[in-house]
Design a protein with these regions (language model features):
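Post-signal/leader-peptide non-cytosolic segments of secretory proteins
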Residues: 25-96
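Functionally constrained cores in energy, signaling, and assembly domains
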Residues: 8, 15, 82
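Compositionally biased regions
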Residues: 11-13, 62
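Extracytoplasmic/lumenal soluble domains of exported proteins with redox or metal-associated functions
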Residues: 2, 15-16
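Intrinsic disorder/low-complexity segments in short proteins, especially the signal peptide
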Residues: 10-11, 22
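Bacterial N-terminal signal peptides that target proteins for export
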Residues: 1-10
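C-terminal segment of classical bacterial N-terminal signal peptides
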Residues: 16-22
Length: 96
């Protein structure tokens, strides 16, 4: 009996978890703009010898789909935080 109750509770919570996940995911149009802006930042960093050496990891990928697909799975706020991290790095290495 308790196994059935546990199963019912688990199944009834599933739609709420799905809705919560969808509420956090970013909009595809937002993610296209995010990925374009990320690539502009990456290109800017690669073109500056003072910055290029520190461009490591997926944050600095030259592949549009890496940025776009990542963005689709996170909130707008998380995408903004990633953009801001790239901006801070670029300002630091260029001195601007």
């Amino acid at each position: 009996m308790t196994n059935r109750l546990l199963l019912r509770v688990s199944l009834s919570a599933l739609p709420m978890l799905i809705l919560f996940r969808e509420a956090q995911a970013a909009d595809p149009a937002f993610c296209r703009q995010y990925a374009k802006a990320a690539l502009n930042q990456v290109r800017g960093g690669l073109s500056d010898p003072a910055c290029a050496g520190g461009l490591q990891g997926s944050r600095w990928s030259t592949d549009f789909s890496v940025h776009y697909e990542w963005c689709l799975g996170i909130s707008d706020a998380a995408a903004g935080g990633e953009r801001d991290a790239r901006t801070r790095y670029l300002r630091g290495c260029t001195g601007r």
